[in-house]
């Protein structure tokens, strides 16, 4: 159970970082 929770947390963090970088790149392109 602990492994699944840690894996889900890691996946959520990776998704958040990826989306943040993607949004940042889009803002740079608009400027």
UniProtKB/Swiss-Prot annotation:
Cellular component GO terms held in the UniProt record: chloroplast thylakoid membrane; cytochrome b6f complex
Biological process per Gene Ontology, one example term: photosynthesis
Keyword check for Repeat: no
InterPro entries listed in its UniProt record: Cyt_b6/f_cplx_su6 (IPR007802)
Signal peptide: none
Compartments where found: Plastid, Chloroplast thylakoid membrane
Record carries keyword Coiled coil: no
Domain of life: Eukaryota
SUPFAM superfamilies assigned to the protein according to its UniProt record, in alphabetical order: PetL subunit of the cytochrome b6f complex (SSF103436)
Membrane-spanning residues: 4-24
Subunit structure: The 4 large subunits of the cytochrome b6-f complex are cytochrome b6, subunit IV (17 kDa polypeptide, PetD), cytochrome f and the Rieske protein, while the 4 small subunits are PetG, PetL, PetM and PetN. The complex functions as a dimer.
Entries under PANTHER family matching the protein: CYTOCHROME B6-F COMPLEX SUBUNIT 6
Record-stated family: Belongs to the PetL family.
Role noted for this protein: Component of the cytochrome b6-f complex, which mediates electron transfer between photosystem II (PSII) and photosystem I (PSI), cyclic electron flow around PSI, and state transitions. PetL is important for photoautotrophic growth as well as for electron transfer efficiency and stability of the cytochrome b6-f complex.
Full protein name: Cytochrome b6-f complex subunit 6
Organism name: Morus indica (Mulberry)
């Amino acid at each position: 159970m602990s492994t699944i929770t840690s894996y889900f947390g890691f996946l959520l963090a990776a998704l958040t970082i990826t989306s943040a970088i993607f949004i940042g790149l889009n803002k740079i392109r608009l400027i």
